[in-house]
Regions:
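Core catalytic lobe of class I
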Residues: 1-237
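S-adenosyl-L-methionine
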Residues: 240-260
Length: 260
């Protein structure tokens, strides 16, 4: 349960109830996406607790999401694993399996940290507007410089270099009444997905806008952004973030007036 609102998907009694609610959304996501285009989902597997689930372990939430998306017609296209610091996770969650004292007590209950994933789904069909690069956007010389790092870096199945704190500021969105969950997505993750799978001028949609990270990065990169957010404090924070971006884009550097 993330909030007391009945509209919150996280306010579900069970996994079955969550996916029953979520199914209405996945069907519409499939409907509005162009054929051959991409939907990227940021997620992680979920730790269980003895009190809530009856056992200590991990739920395959990533796999459940993939199967749900496949059930409405999506093709499982790709995924990337994003490393997270287990020490930071231990300090934040106090998870039994990450505590060093558990190693001394019974290491059979010790586990590794849980990474983030970006699961990439594709809608079947021919893409009516291909995402391509040109000699102008990727000159041969530039390509020769970045070719190896792209495969080792941007296209690696594990991204080691994502700064977990490189997010929009969420502090203003915390209203103190029903706040139990807010985790803004790291901007470099969004940037890489948009660069790989969209063209300038494309419309990028997010059904869970939060404080506006995806819309912010989309507009910053010359795309259009459309987002839906039910919580008023998050929505206001997203509007503030977009206003700040607009102000930044309108600012003119002193060097623009100088002959360098």
């Amino acid at each position: 349960t993330y909030s007391n609102s009945d509209r919150d998907l996280g306010n579900s009694k069970s996994d079955d109830q969550f996916f029953e609610h979520f199914h209405f959304i996945t069907k519409e996501l499939f409907r509005i996406l162009k054929p051959g285009r991409i939907m990227a989902v940021h997620c992680m597997n979920l730790p269980t607790s003895k009190e809530r689930d009856g056992y200590i372990g991990i739920k395959d939430f990533r796999g459940d999401l993939i199967r749900e998306f496949q059930s409405v017609g999506f093709i499982y296209h790709a995924e990337v694993c994003i490393w997270k610091n287990p020490v930071t996770a231990m300090q934040r969650t106090k998870a039994l399996g990450l505590l060093h004292k558990q190693i001394k007590k019974d290491s059979c209950m010790s586990r590794m940290g849980i990474p983030d994933y970006v699961v990439v789904m594709r809608k079947p069909g021919d893409n009516p507007e291909r995402v391509t690069h040109t000699n102008e956007t990727y000159p041969v010389g530039h390509w020769q410089e970045v070719a190896s790092p792209i495969w080792e870096y941007d296209y690696s199945p594990v991204w080691w270099d994502i700064n977990q704190s490189d997010t929009l500021n969420a502090r203003a969105a915390r209203d103190g009444r029903d706040e139990r969950h807010i985790c803004p997505l790291q901007l470099p993750v969004i940037e890489r997905m948009l660069d790989l799978y969209t063209n300038e001028g494309d419309t990028v949609f997010t059904p869970f806008m939060g404080i506006g990270s995806e819309v912010y990065q989309a507009v910053k990169m010359g795309r259009r952004g459309v987002g839906i957010e039910l919580k008023e404090s998050y929505f206001k924070c997203a509007c503030d973030n977009m206003s700040n971006l607009e102000m930044e884009r309108k600012q003119i550097s002193l060097f623009d007036f100088m002959d360098m």
